[in-house]
Amino acid sequence: MRRRSRSMRLTLKHTKDWVPCCPTSETAQQRAFTLKRDSKITQSRACPYRGHKPPIHLVQLVSSGGGNIPTAHLLDDAVFQTSVIVTDQVSPLARLPPHQLVFNAIGDADCCEPALRAAIGLVERTKMPVINDPSAVMKTGRVANSIRLRAVPGVVTALTVPMTKQVLLSPQGPATLAREGFYFPMLLRSPGYHTGRNFVMVGTANELTAVAASLPGEQLLAIEFLDACRSDGTSRKYRVMMIDGQLYPLHLAISRDWKVHYFTSEMSEKADYRAEEARFLENMADVLGHKAVASLEAISKTLGLDYAGVDFGLSETGDVLLFEANATMIISRAGHQAHWAYRHGAIDRAIGAAMAMIEKRSGALTEKAR
């Protein structure tokens, strides 16, 4: 077997680094998305195949700057021979290697536009099935979602407007926000970051300059604050995966902070929080209500993605308060401690559904493609 070059080994290492290892570890979840800012993948290579039967040949499309869906736990290297193509690093005229399926793993429309545009050109030249068509992913940026998903019955989206830091730092910053329909408190975010990084609340007009100056990038997102806080002072963030047209509840995080993330919440310390999450995972429709479930199904249909997820809260009237809906959602394994045992079934169902979808899409054409 030919010895792999150093650049090839580097590419494969980065491919595995996209997978976080613990749902309650901040560093693990952040590592999956830090790569979009801090490292570059420069080569396209084939991953090792470890199976004994003839493999299913799969092309995986990724971005050089990150924003990719973690897939190592979904693609069994004893089943798939995976060729990873970094779309924004190859020629637009490049030929795809022999394949039976294309998995577009580029998930973040806000930071991966060049890679997605290149991916659109690549998939136009294949007749094989494509999971997560890049043209559909391209429509899932935060600004675009805030506009199109507000038309879904029972869904409340946050007004989201891109603004330059220069405008926000100027004396006219508060007035500009007011003209766009914002009021305080409101949120500012640097595009392309996840896990709560560079995402802050601006409580008053007097805080605007300091907060805007603290964020990286010259283009920021001004976002309406959707208050999901209940009378007891807690806020909830539900995550539901949308896989092959079906909904899979994944987790519920409860926190006294407005910015709710699983790894910063008190889920590990609060047995009553975990009991509420267990009820959500066991019977999503009863916890959310049929109105919210219908709204989630409509969101899934509107997104048009094979693999995606949605983070949201609930209003007092049962409306979905949409925080995020796209393909970048991570399915993380729960810890092995006994108090996380109730989470394993839901996680297994979501991962199993994704794996079954991938094999189904490829298997339908396996014999024909060989």
Give the label of every model feature segment.
Residues 3-5, 37-38:
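Canonical positions in the second alpha-helix
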Residues 9, 42-43:
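Short coil turns that delineate tetratricopeptide repeat
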Residues 47-54, 62-169, 176:
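Conserved N-proximal alpha/beta basic substrate-recognition cap immediately N-terminal to
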Residues 157-160, 184-210:
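Glycine-rich phosphate-binding loop of ATP-grasp-fold ATP-dependent ligases
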Residues 199-295, 299:
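Phosphate-binding site of ATP-dependent enzymes
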Residues 301-305, 314-370:
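C-terminal active-site "lid" helix and adjoining low-complexity regulatory extension at the edge
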